[in-house]
Amino acid sequence: MSAPRTLYDKIFDDHLVDRQDDGTCLLYIDRHLVHEVTSPQAFEGLRMAGRKVHAPTRTLAVVDHNVPTTPDRAEGIKNEESRIQVEALAKNAADFGVEYYSEKDKRQGIVHIVGPEQGFTLPGMTIVCGDSHTSTHGAFGALAHGIGTSEVEHVLATQTLIQKKAKNMLVRVDGKLPAGVTAKDIILAIIGEIGTAGGTGHVIEFAGEAIEALSMEGRMTVCNMTIEGGARAGLIAPDEKTFEYIKGKPRAPKGEELEMALQYWKTLHTDEGAHFDRTVVLDAANLPPIVSWGSSPEDVISVQGVVPNPDDIADENKRTSKWRALDYMGLKPGTKITDITIDRVFIGSCTNGRIEDLRAAAAVLKDRKVASTVSAMVVPGSGLVKEQAEAEGLDKIFLDAGCEWREPGCSMCLAMNDDRLKPEERCASTSNRNFEGRQGYKGRTHLVSPAMAAAAAIAGHFVDIREWK
């Protein structure tokens, strides 16, 4: 009888092509997602070597990082570098026979939102993309992680990847979430607990009652930010919610193929007694709505808290780092989080750009107005999310409140397109990173949930969504 295995062990073993004596492994890759920023050199490498894409039907190309989100984007991309990258992806996809969703295709959107909604992402698969937030797809019980540009070329050419097996880490969130606390708060709390290096060298499996209670959208939010916790990939075991989400998706198996797939998918869970190298347990009942205060995703605190004093930190290097973060953010120790005023609000990204996220923001904004001192932008994560939101009338709620309603794309999550902060502008953002300059030169980012961002847009400062009337 074989030893009990974790979910990660099972998927890894099922895709193992070869293992060397030093632990170096060759894994088969089921799905490869491609976007315009990390793929040009990879395709050029294939072209120069006279190689083909090994499995074009297992590859999907989507433009997302550089595309404008303004209504006039059909007129073209003004920034030359961005335009060249987008044009290169279109040409490369055509030359190598890879399916491509351009900015004119309603299926276009952020690659990590497009994959699941197309049924391209399925349980038990290995999935890679030249993007660190590929961990999002782990919400389906898939082993998914980002890869570098040279690895993109390797996967295109061979449909395999060289890597060493990671350690197993379990993060269990027990109990029920209080009202007003969301998947975004769960993952921010986890990162606050373990730090941005806490998962280094591990694949994290998220489990527990609070995780199981999340919708698929919520699970994607949690897995999306696994990389901010230091782990390359995050996993959640698939269940009936997963299967129902997948059924009927364009690329999902159907009929007898679906029945066969379900038999396999139902084996994708950690065996009782399987070994984890590290376990972290959180109590969902104690989790508050969370706001980041510094320039790292681990710099988080309850909305009812105050900006911490770095002098309370014993480690000199960490203390210096946190003082630098406060200086960059223009904040002082002891400041109440609810006293921090904001200039901008960004609702979107591969973390929180799905229909559930937009519904949560719209529920707060309905029949209210964005503060006169705040500029708010809502960017759906895909053309299909946009279509669904408009069918539900969410766009009208956003526009009536004074928000901008945009076209799909990565937008203000990162300063690679026209959506960016000006120096020292402060933004309540539903994205995943608050690094220096992430949303624009000297821009100040606070990471929050969609409902918290919407409430801040109305109040002009952070508020506790649990007390929102």
UniProtKB/Swiss-Prot annotation:
Its cofactor is [4Fe-4S] cluster. PROSITE patterns: ACONITASE_1, ACONITASE_2. [4Fe-4S] cluster binds at C350, C410, C413. SUPFAM superfamilies: Aconitase iron-sulfur domain. One of its GO terms (biological process) is L-leucine biosynthetic process. InterPro entries: 3-IsopropMal_deHydase_lsu, Acnase/IPM_dHydase_lsu_aba_1/3, Acoase/IPM_deHydtase_lsu_aba, Aconitase_4Fe-4S_BS, Aconitase_4Fe-4S_dom, IPM_dehydratase_rel_enz, IPMI_cat. It is an enzyme of class 4 (lyase). Binds 1 [4Fe-4S] cluster per subunit. It comes from the Bacteria. It catalyses: (2R,3S)-3-isopropylmalate = (2S)-2-isopropylmalate. Pathway: Amino-acid biosynthesis; L-leucine biosynthesis; L-leucine from 3-methyl-2-oxobutanoate: step 2/4. Keywords: 4Fe-4S, Amino-acid biosynthesis, Branched-chain amino acid biosynthesis, Iron, Iron-sulfur, Leucine biosynthesis, Lyase, Metal-binding. Its EC number is 4.2.1.33. One of its GO terms (molecular function) is 4 iron, 4 sulfur cluster binding. Belongs to the aconitase/IPM isomerase family. LeuC type 1 subfamily. Heterodimer of LeuC and LeuD. Catalyzes the isomerization between 2-isopropylmalate and 3-isopropylmalate, via the formation of 2-isopropylmaleate. This is 3-isopropylmalate dehydratase large subunit. It comes from Allorhizobium ampelinum (strain ATCC BAA-846 / DSM 112012 / S4) (Agrobacterium vitis (strain S4)).
